[in-house]
Amino acid sequence: MAFKSLIAFVALAAAVRAAPTAVCPDGTRVSHAACCAFIPLAQDLQETIFQNECGEDAHEVIRLTFHDAIAISRSQGPKAGGGADGSMLLFPTVEPNFSANNGIDDSVNNLIPFMQKHNTISAADLVQFAGAVALSNCPGAPRLEFLAGRPNKTIAAVDGLIPEPQDSVTKILQRFEDAGGFTPFEVVSLLASHSVARADKVDQTIDAAPFDSTPFTFDTQVFLEVLLKGVGFPGSANNTGEVASPLPLGSGSDTGEMRLQSDFALAHDPRTACIWQGFVNEQAFMAASFRAAMSKLAVLGHNRNSLIDCSDVVPVPKPATGQPAMFPASTGPQDLELSCPSERFPTLTTQPGASQSLIAHCPDGSMSCPGVQFNGPA
């Protein structure tokens, strides 16, 4: 696939970093003195919120990076929003109350204290850097580019700029194009984030419903499992933005898998189906594609040439598990619903077991893993 050759070139170019030119107070050598402030911030985020895990608190901050950045519109102009500008944190009683941001108040309230503690760092930089640190805890994730120097925004974004799971593919693609000229390939690439994501508000009867069977690992399972025949719902049925899932079984806090209507639609639309299918069992390709698309998303509203490359202070992510994509137990090739005849589907094995396995609620496999939740204005 031509996309894969292009992404491989981009990944190689991104690996070439400038030689360190500054020494931070802790002795770390970095490419620019301005990057030093992010070293204690990363440590603070890990110790206070993430605990070095790809858990719910990390998932929520990764979601925040997208919701903060996509709030920009080329057609509506500057009054609509400033993109990756930290406005979620700066206007916590405004944007978190938009329906598309339902549930984002947790991550907003968790990050607000860091604005005071690390007050040389803008809210805009805090959001994107926190997301990069959060993602580094997810095995298989790429090390994201991080550019520092975004100024804070002085106005909140308007409502209606965040894509929602009930939106049509046409509306989603138009929104991304209007936000920053994103291509369908880049849109699907960004949805690799759903491999480490869960939903709390789509179905109000359940919490932390994962989008694939491995929600604590950045892998291609989500691209496989969205292509499997839906058989039920993890909670109640007929929720806006949700369609039947192939793995709805849950027990206690181990919630069954949820399938978003928008993911299902993108996996089958002629404009995006082959892109979606092409990520199945292509871990390195998916990770590199996501990194490239995130590099574009994270600077919406800014001139990247005016920012400082501080990628060298982003923690090195945990390595991939090495586990290939597999059909979950109780499913197999007979359950595939494919919409791309031109993309060869890989030969995959099936996990052992005659019935669906429960999806663990916590990274360590347990049912109880209390998260961090600060009180705040959002």
Curated annotation (Swiss-Prot):
Q: Name which cysteines form disulfide bonds.
A: 24-36, 35-310, 54-138, 274-340, 362-369
* Record-linked PROSITE patterns: PEROXIDASE_1 (PS00435), PEROXIDASE_2 (PS00436), PEROXIDASE_4 (PS50873)
Which Pfam families does the record associate with it?
A: peroxidase, Peroxidase_ext
**Residues making up the signal peptide according to the UniProt record:** 1-21
Tell me where on the tree of life, at the top rank, the source sits.
Answer: Eukaryota
TM region(s), chain numbering? none
- Say yes or no: keyword Repeat present: no
Q: Which GO molecular function annotation, any one, does this entry have? A: metal ion binding
PANTHER family cross-referenced by the UniProt entry: CATALASE-PEROXIDASE, THYLAKOID LUMENAL 29 KDA PROTEIN, CHLOROPLASTIC-RELATED
> What name does UniProt use for this protein?
Manganese peroxidase 1
Native species? Phanerodontia chrysosporium (White-rot fungus)
